[in-house]
UniProtKB/Swiss-Prot annotation:
Induction: By sexual inducer glycoprotein. InterPro entries: Pherophorin. This is Perphorin-2. Keywords: Extracellular matrix, Glycoprotein, Secreted. It holds the Pfam family DUF3707.
Amino acid sequence: AVTPGSIPNFPFRDCNTTNGAYRLAPVWRPSGSNTYCFKIQVSQDALSCTGACCSADLHKIEFNVCSSCLVAGASVDATVNGVRTRVGATLDKAPAGPVGSAVLRLTQLGLDTTTAQDAEVCLTLKTNRGGQGCTTLDQLCSSPGFPAGTCTAAMFDVACDCCPVSQAGQALPPPPPVIPPVLRPCDVCIAATIVPPANDVRPYRYDSATCAAIQQNIANAMNSLLGGANINVFSPFAPNASQCFDTQIITCGRFNGSDTDALANLTEAVQQQLSAFIGVASGGNVCNPKLEKYTVTVSTINNVADQCLDLSQSASCFLPGVPFPNCTCNTTQGVMPFTVSPTWYAQPANVRWGRNVTEYCFTVNTLQPSQVVPSTCYNANDALAKIEWYASDAFRSAVKGFTVYPAGGSNKTIADSWGATGTDTLKVNLNWNLLQANGGKVCVAIQNPFTMGDICKGALGQCYASIFNRDNSDYCCPIYRTGP
């Protein structure tokens, strides 16, 4: 039986939200009374998908919708390339989602990687006889952190293993007719979007300072590319705080696109720049631990009248697996109400460890009960028994021990402890309850000049940390990637 609230984030299913060939084009278009159309894009490159998800058919699309649209008698008609879907669109509650979550489901689509490319899906929203129900995408679509009218959709294969999530938003309104008709005004925005995983146990959201820095970086690059293409600029790309959202940052400019050759050169230059923009949007590296399991997308948004630049690129971090931890246990993030912060920091060491020693501190946080992923390995009130790091045996002598700081309690020092030689495992026993763990920290004392990044294995300059609730059969050991 499905447990209500067991999967708090869309698509409210246990599937891979970042791996798949199908996504919505960044912009939807209106088409007559209460009808809205979305274009499907197919991308089978390594940044979009791996393995079977790259070739799977598109069986079903589910949209994240507002439960207020689930009104008796209200309905949605769906077509693909002008033909009604084989099975009618249905509005339904999400059984595993939080209270109030709902989806619009289009199933048995029968599309593949060839027939889905540029296929157009149109939705006609109808009220009941009493005029109740949703008639606009502002009312229908639920996309927290995005501008109103943005729709979030998941594309499923038949087995519902692959479910890449993407967004489509409103096009910018046409500009007022103040520019002479001999010119071609191009109102273009660059949208940098982070798409959280379905199980978002370490949520990362853009703050105002990060947004301003990313907007400035993108603006500088776009203005330089416009100059290099010898294109006349009406309004340079520039930061705008009103275009900063939790999971999306938009940077806009306006230029003359009447010279088709110059516009073609600009298009090629911006296409080559998209990977750099993804790096900017992800803090320098898409494998930044803060964005573990996230997808980063950079795309253009144009005005309705003229699609001057139509570009998009997505990336996720796919690192090779590591032989850690050295046991058989449940490594799924979120199966315990404890997490390790994606960043560590350095501080002066406890005097016990002597001179020329630095401590590298990892903060522990806790989840709400509704965020914990159901499993057989965790029982209510299980303690945070220990933390293990994937660390090189070659640096055993450099690790002096631990200083641990339970929340609300006194700190204490603990001697270093390692697994058997060859397992490359550094560990510390804690036995913390939820109160002690929420904001508690564990600091590893390391002899200079070595650093935490030196002793950790797996990802260059980063660490894999695994947390445990016990050491006997059927236990939890979720793995979290961390960095400086």
